[in-house]
Amino acid sequence: FPGFIDIHVHGWATGSFWFEKTSQSLREMCRTLPFAGVTSYLGTTGADPIEEIKTCIRAADQVSEEDPEGAQLLGVHLEGPFINPVYKGMQKEECCLLPDVTVMEDLYNTFKNKKLCRHMTIAPERPGADAVLRFCQEHQIQTAVGHSAATFEEIKKMRAYGLGGFTHTFSGMKGFHHRELGTAGAALYFDDMICEFAKQTGMTVSHEAFELAYRIKGSSRIVLTTDCCGLAQTQSCFDHYVRKIRFVKDRDQVCLEHYDGKKEWIDPRDYQAVKQVEMSYAQSVKNMADHTKVGLYDIMLMTSFNPAHYIHADDCKGSIRPGMDADLTIMDQNLDLICVY
C-alpha cells in the first residue's frame, strides 16, 4: 500500500502530543508510528487552554524543521477548541469555546510554518463559526464537523464556507432522526464530504454502522484514522469511559484502574508494553477488513489516497507513482504488517 496516513492521532505508545505537549512527544510518535504501519500523520491537539495549544503548535514547528527519521509530521489537526460542550466526549468542558475568529487568527499566526496548520474540527452550529470557517477556507485549512449538535440545515448552510468532512463520524455528534437528519444524517447525505472513522474496532461505532456508511458513501469518501491518545503518557488521570478504564500516573508507572476493580501497572517508556494499550493503525485496518466487505483497493483509498487528498498533501503523498514520496506499507495476505519504507 502507499504509506498509511493518520490525520487524527493525539499520541501513540511512548509519545503523546496531547498529554505532553512537547517536541519530544512528537519525536517519539515519528519514531514509533511506523511500527503501526503509519508513514505520515497530523499531530492532533485537544480542547485545552489556548496557551497550551500554542505550546503544541511551537513544538510541531520545531519537529517539522528537524524532520526526524520515521513517520513524517505533515502538520497539526486542531480538534477544538471551538467544539460543543454538549458533545465534548473526553474533551475538557471548560475549554470548549465559542468560535472566535480573533482566537483562530492568533492560533494560525503562532505557526512559523503556516502550511502545518492543515485541519480543524469545529462545531459549525455555534455562534461565530461562519467567520472561523471563512478564515480557514481563505487559508486552505481543511475543516470538519465534530463534537457537534449541528442540524442538517445548519450543515447544509455552512458547507458554503468549506466544510469538508466529519470527525469520528457518528461519535460525538447529533444523531439521526427521520424528520431531522442531524449531524450523523448529514454525514451520510452529502456525498462530497468525507467521513472520518476513528479506530474501527466495533466499540465506539458498531461494525454494522460502519458498513452502512461504507455502502452509502463508498470507499472514496471514507478516511480511516485511529484517534489514539498515547494513553500511557497521561500526566495525571485520564478516564476512558468507553473502555471503562482510568489511566492514572503513579510515579514512574501508569496504573490502569479497571471499573471492575482490577489494577495493572505498566512502564510508559516500554514500547512493547504500551503498544498493547490502544489498537494500532495496522490493527485497525485488519479489524475493519475482518468485519466488513472492504477490498484491498478500498483500503488503499481509506488509508492513503483519501487522507492525502483531504488535507491537501496529495502532491507528494497517498499514491505510488513517479515523483511521489516513496512511502510504502507492506502487509501480508492476512493483512498483518510486515514492514514500512
Tell where the protein language model's regions lie, with residue ranges.
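Metal-associated gating/positioning segment near the N- to mid-region
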Residues: 1-55
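Charged helix-capping and loop-helix junction motifs
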Residues: 23-25, 56-60, 178-184
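Active-site flanking residues adjacent to catalytic metal/cofactor-binding acidic residues
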Residues: 5, 167, 226-227, 326, ...
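Active-site mouth loops of central-metabolism enzymes
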Residues: 11-24, 91-98, 142-146
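Active-site core of metal-dependent hydrolases
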Residues: 108-236
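Conserved phosphate-binding/catalytic loop of the ribokinase/pfkB sugar-kinase fold
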Residues: 84-109
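His/Asp/Glu-enriched, well-ordered alpha-helical/loop segment
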Residues: 186-195, 215-226, 232-324, 328
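Conserved, mostly hydrophobic/aromatic
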Residues: 33, 78, 136, 166, ...
